[in-house]
């Protein structure tokens, strides 16, 4: 047989490019004060199904794992602080359905091909969209409908900021190069945070981040399925600014709001804002009582 040169191979090769859009995945962001309560609700919705909960630190993995275990849930855990043997055993328990739920840091998932993961919960917001897409994308690899839920709180931003600002241990980079890396990480964190606040289609935001076009309404994310009422607050903003200016910027936001609402609070009366501020709204007879 005559051996073919590399040129022949290159001529015959086909490059297959797949997009970022996976229409079977439902995306949702929930702003949560009590994240464990949200997790329990989600687990009830996905009872008997396989899922992953991603946490930002090993400590949180342990806390969430213990809380779920105490509630009688078949759960296992994975992070870099465990021994190789324990990580392998826990990974196998999840893959072979001996435990339906995995609580893990981002150390879990590389090279794992479990097609029937029905939900991925992010207990914390990741540091960038790349990490979120990769981790959320471990749901629904069999093409069946699956959910990707992000539980957001402001503390997530501060935690990620701390990690970014303290990531200065790379001796191969100069100080200038290190600052450039950190600046890019800050920008990526900002884009990730915007994802948690946008009222637009979450899928459109994600695809736009990765440079892919989207139609603007996917019908399979929390924003597209939520009815939002747009309210013009410019009038109220102007009134508030006028009140601040009239008070010569002497008082905090609470006192300004109390003045605009006609409150007879201790500060309003002490500063005689009820008498001297033109924007003070007199309370109704019912309010006085």
Model region roles, listed by residue range:
Residues 73, 94-99, 112-116, 121-279:
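C-terminal helicase lobe
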Residues 1-10, 280-289:
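Single conserved hydrophobic/aromatic residue that forms the stacking wall/gate
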Residues 12-13, 126, 250, 283-285:
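Proline-rich low-complexity regions
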């Amino acid at each position: 047989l005559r051996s073919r040169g590399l040129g022949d191979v290159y001529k015959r090769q086909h490059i297959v490019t797949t997009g970022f859009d996976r229409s079977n995945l439902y995306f949702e962001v929930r702003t949560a004060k009590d994240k464990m309560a949200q997790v329990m609700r989600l687990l009830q919705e996905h009872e008997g199904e396989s899922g992953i909960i991603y946490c930002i630190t090993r400590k949180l993995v342990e806390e969430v794992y213990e809380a779920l275990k105490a509630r009688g849930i078949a759960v296992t855990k994975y992070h870099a602080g465990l021994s190789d043997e324990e990580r392998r055993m826990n990974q196998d328990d999840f893959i072979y359905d001996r435990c339906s739920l995995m609580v893990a840091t981002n150390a879990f998932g590389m090279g794992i091909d479990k097609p029937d993961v029905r939900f991925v919960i992010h207990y914390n917001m990741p540091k960038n969209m790349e990490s979120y897409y990769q981790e959320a994308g471990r749901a629904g690899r069999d093409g069946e409908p699956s959910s990707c839920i992000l539980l957001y709180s402001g503390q997530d931003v501060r935690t990620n900021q701390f990690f970014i600002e303290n990531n200065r241990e790379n001796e191969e980079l100069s100080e200038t190069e290190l600052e450039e890396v950190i600046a890019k990480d800050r920008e990526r964190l900002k884009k990730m945070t915007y994802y948690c606040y946008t009222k637009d289609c979450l899928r459109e935001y994600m695809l736009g981040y990765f440079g892919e076009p989207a139609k603007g309404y996917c019908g399979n994310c929390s924003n597209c399925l939520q009815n939002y009422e747009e309210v013009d607050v410019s009038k109220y903003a102007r009134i508030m600014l006028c009140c601040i200016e009239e008070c010569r910027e002497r008082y905090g936001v609470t006192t300004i709001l109390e003045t605009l609402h006609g409150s007879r609070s201790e500060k309003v009366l002490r500063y005689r804002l009820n008498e001297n501020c033109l924007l003070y709204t007199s309370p109704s007879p019912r309010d006085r009582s």
